[in-house]
Amino acid sequence: MRTWVIAVVALVGSGGAALAQDAAAGEQVLKRLCSPCHDVGPEAKIKLGPPLNGIDGRKAGTYEGFNYSPANKSSGITWNEQAFDKYIRAPMQEMPGTRMAFVGIKNDKDVADIWAYLNQFRPEGAKK
């Protein structure tokens, strides 16, 4: 009986555990949901949004040449997996005043996969 209780507690406690990330799946989700506004890779250009190369560790509102909203510039966010996860689910709620008019991505796997894909790229667009 004690073993079952421990197993159930371990199972319930792991609900917030990180999902396996699939960069190839993330590329497809990014192409479908993000590429109308964002670019990534060696030839990435500014579109409606900034390129997403080298996002891990970059301060929000700092991609050179992109006209960010005051909300982005003053957000104090440094992008990492946790900040991205929270923001991408509801950008306009997480950063009131952002120009990113996007309802967000609710699917946990899609969010994890997009991060895995983006995290492959250095600031200049080459893969790590």
Predicted regions and their residues:
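Extracytoplasmic/secreted proteins, especially bacterial periplasmic and envelope-associated proteins
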Residues: 25-29, 47, 51, 83, ...
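Positively charged n-region of N-terminal signal peptides that target proteins for export
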Residues: 1-4
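Cleavable N-terminal signal peptides
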Residues: 7-8, 18
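Sequence/structural segment immediately N-terminal to covalent heme-attachment motifs in c-type
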Residues: 21-44, 52
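Electron-transfer interface patches adjacent to heme c in soluble/periplasmic c-type cytochromes
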Residues: 39-43, 54-83, 101-112
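Residues at helix-coil transition
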Residues: 31, 39, 57, 89, ...
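N-terminal signal peptide c-region/cleavage motif recognized by signal peptidases
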Residues: 13-17
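C-terminal capping alpha-helices of c-type cytochrome domains
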Residues: 78-128
